[in-house]
Amino acid sequence: MFGLFLLASVLLLGLIIAELLVGGGNVTLSDVLQAPSRPQSLAQIIIETIRLPRALAAVLVGAALAAAGVIMQTVLRNPLAAPDILAVTSGAQLALIIASLLLPFAFPGFLATILGGAIGGGLCLLVGGGLRAQPVRLALAGVAISLAFSALSSAIVLMADDRASGILLWSSGLLEQSGWTRVASLAPAILAGILLLALLGRQFDVMALGNDMASGLGLGKAPAIIGLLATVVLSGAAVSIAGPIGFIGLAVPNFLRAVGFHKHGLLLPAAGLLGAVALLAADVAAQLLSSPGTIIPAGVFAACFAAPVLILVLRRIKGETRTRANVVSQKVLFQRKTVLYPVLAGLMVAAFLLGLLFGDGVAGWQTDWNTVYALRMPRVLIAMGAGALLACAGLLLQLVTRNPLSGPETLGLSQGAALAGLAGLLIGVVPGSPLFALLALLGAGLVVLCISLLSIRMSPERTALTGIAVAASLAALSTIIVIEAKLQVAEALSWLAGSTHGRNWQDVTALAPWLVLIPLMMILARWFDILAMGRDEAESIGLNTMSARIWTMLLASLAVAGAVATVGAIGFVGLIAPHAARLCSGARYRQLVPVTALIGAILTAFADMFGRTLIAPQEIPTGIVTAFIGAPLFILLMRRQSR
C-alpha cells in the first residue's frame, strides 16, 4: 500500500508539471522552473493565472469526486454508487444552470449546486428503493433521473442564445480557469468535506461490516446521513469548479477496493490522491489531443471510459443473473381493433395538422401556405417516419433480447449510428446519401454485436445499464469529433440529441425508402410470434432461432440507421412505444408492428411540435423533449420489472 501511495504521489507531481507545460502559450520546462525568479515574464503570468489554477482545480475536483464515491459506496453498500450515477452531479448541474441563467440573484452558485445535488440524490433514492436498494436498480434510477435533468438543462441552455457556447463547454466538464477566484473560494469546502469524512473513518469501517453488525455495535444513522450530506457538498463544489465530470467517483473507489484498500483511514486519502491523478491525466491527455484552436473538455475525455469501467464493476457484483424477462403486457386496453385503429388514426391526423399549424410562433394558418409546405410539412413527415422506424426497432430489440428495458438508446444503437455518421462527415460523406446511411448501419450493427456479447447471462437491468454505459462512451467520442472537426457545436450537438431542424423535401425522399422496413416486419410477424415463445418451443416448431435472431437484429439495425441518418439520435421512442403498443393491442406481432409504428410516429410528431413552440423562436431538439418525457416512463418500467 505504501508503494501505491508513493507511485501516485510521483505521478501527481509529474502530471502537475505536465499540466503547466501543455496548452497554448509555449511554456517550457525552463519557464516553469524559473517562474518564481522571473515574476514579470509572459510565461510566469500564464503559469500563475491560467495553468496553476487549472492544475489545482483538477486536483481538488478529482479528490472530491473520488472521496464522494467512496462514501456513497460504503453507506449504500453499492459498488455502482457515484455522484454522476446517482443523479447528484446532474442535479447540481441543473441547479447551477437555473441559478445562472434564470434566477441569477436568487442563490449563490455553490448553494444552488448543493440544493440541486441533494434533490437529485434524494429523487434517486426515492424511486430506486431507498438506502438498501438493489445496486443495479438504484443505478438505473439515477441514470434515468440524470437523463431527465440533462434534457431540462439542455433546453434551458438553448434559451441562453449567445451564452450557449460557453455553457455547453462547461456542461461537458471543463477545467479551464480564468484566475484563482473559483478555486480559492471552493477549496476550503472541499478540504473541509474530505477532512470531515476522514474523521468519521472508523464509523464507516463499522458501517461496511453490514447493517446487523453495525447496529449491534451501537452505530446510529447519524454517520450515514452526515456522510451523504458531505458527498453532496463535495459534488456540488466539483460541479461549481469544472462542471459535471463522471466516472472518477465510480472507478477510483472500486479500483482501490480491488487492490486491497478497505479501511477508510487509508481508503479516503488514497482515493483523493488517485482521483486527482486520474483527472489530471485525463485533462493532460485531452489537451495533448486537442488541435490548435479547439478545447476537448476533461469530462468528455473521462466519459470515453464509461463503458469499460461500468462493465468491469458490473462483473464484480454477485447475484441478479436472471437472463431474460417477460415483455408481454398482461392488460389490453382495446379488445376491439375497430376502436383502436380509428383512435390512432385520429391522433395521427391531429399530430400532423398541429405540426403544420404551429411553427416557430403561433401565427397558425395565417402563415403563408408556401412556407408551411416548404418548411413545416417536411419536418412533420420526417418526425413521423423516424419515430415509426425507431419504435419498430425497439420492438424487435425487446423481442430478441427478451428485455423490456431494451431500446435503440438504452442499448447504444442510436449513439453508435450517430458516431459512425459523424465519422462519415469527416471524410466528406454527404448526410442523407446512401453511403451515410450505410455508415450509420455499420455503427448500429457493431453496437448490437458488442452488447450481445457483453450481456450473455445478464439480467435485463444489467443489460440496460451496460448499454447506457456504451452509449455514454459513444456520445463522448461523438462530442470529441464535433470539437476536433470544428463543426458548429450547437448545431452538431442538437443533431446528436435528435432534431428535425433544417430538414427539407430532399430529406423526406431520403427517408422514404427506409419505411419499407415496416411492412416487411408485418410480413414477418408470424416469425416474431414464434420467436417470442422462447428458444425451445420455437425450435420444436422448426424455426432456426439463431438465424431468426440475427435477421431480426439486422432489421432493427436497419431501422435505427435510417432514422439516425436523417434526424440524429432521438431517444426513448424505441423504448416506450412498444410497451404502449402492447398495452393497446396485445402480444400478436401482426397488430403490434403497425400499432407500434403509429404510436412512435405520433409521439415523435408531438415532441417535434412542442420543441418548436415551447421557447419559440428558439427550438428544443426533438430528442430532448422525448428524453424529458421518456425518462420518467423508463423509471416506471424499471419499477414494474423489479416486481
Where are the regions a protein language model picked out?
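Alpha-helical transmembrane segments in inner-membrane proteins
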Residues: 1-643
